[in-house]
Regions:
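Acidic (E/D-rich), amphipathic helical modules within compact regulatory domains
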Residues: 37-86
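Hydrophobic/basic alpha-helical segments enriched in Actinobacteria
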Residues: 34-37, 59-60, 102, 129-132
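Short, solvent-exposed interaction modules
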Residues: 74-127
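Amphipathic alpha-helical interaction segments
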Residues: 28, 46-50, 66, 70, ...
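Intrinsic N-terminal pre-sequences and regulatory tails
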Residues: 1-35, 146-147
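Short, recurring structural edge motifs at helix starts
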Residues: 18, 36-42, 50-56, 98-107, ...
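Short, flexible domain-boundary/linker segments around small modular repeats
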Residues: 13, 24-39, 89-104
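Preference for long, well-ordered alpha-helical segments
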Residues: 112, 118-147
Length: 147
């Protein structure tokens, strides 16, 4: 069955894929990240954008396009790919980059990256998330608790 996406409003997306429906808007995404990482909603929004932007540079352009189709509209601007191909970096590089951009310390940033990945897993269909995650080093996968 092909994936179908229908916008209910500017920030809410419903995605059907193999009978799976996911409904999450950007505000819910930020709220979930804030709760998981124990941050303010504003900090969670900044963190989410920084993490998604960095991770999008780490995966193929095709995977970024697939992820964009599955995200709430307000998060799409954070997800752009590197026209020169995926950029290689490890988890420590990601944490350092996001920490510098958000002003969070490295412990808060690591917890925040975990929160963004966990929330992303809930916000997009399982297949899309697994395809995205498969292009990241194993150390990124280890951040996620078992579903």
């Amino acid at each position: 069955m092909a994936t179908q996406k229908r916008a209910l409003s500017e920030s809410t997306t419903v995605l059907w894929n193999d009978m799976e429906m996911i409904l999450m808007d950007a505000h819910e995404f930020y709220r979930d990240v804030a709760e998981r990482a124990m941050l303010s909603k504003g900090e969670a929004a900044d963190l989410t954008r920084a993490v998604l932007e960095a991770l999008a540079m780490r995966v193929s352009a095709g995977e970024v396009r697939h992820l964009i189709r599955a995200l709430p509209e307000e998060l799409v601007d954070s997800v752009r790919w590197n026209s020169r191909g995926p950029k290689r970096f490890d988890l420590d590089d990601l944490i350092q980059s996001v920490s510098a951009r958000t002003g969070l310390n490295k412990t808060e940033t690591r917890t925040g990256v975990e929160a963004v990945l966990s929330t992303l897993r809930e916000a997009v269909n399982r297949r899309e998330f697994n395809d995205f995650l498969s292009q990241l080093p194993a150390e990124f996968t280890e951040l996620l608790p078992s579903p």
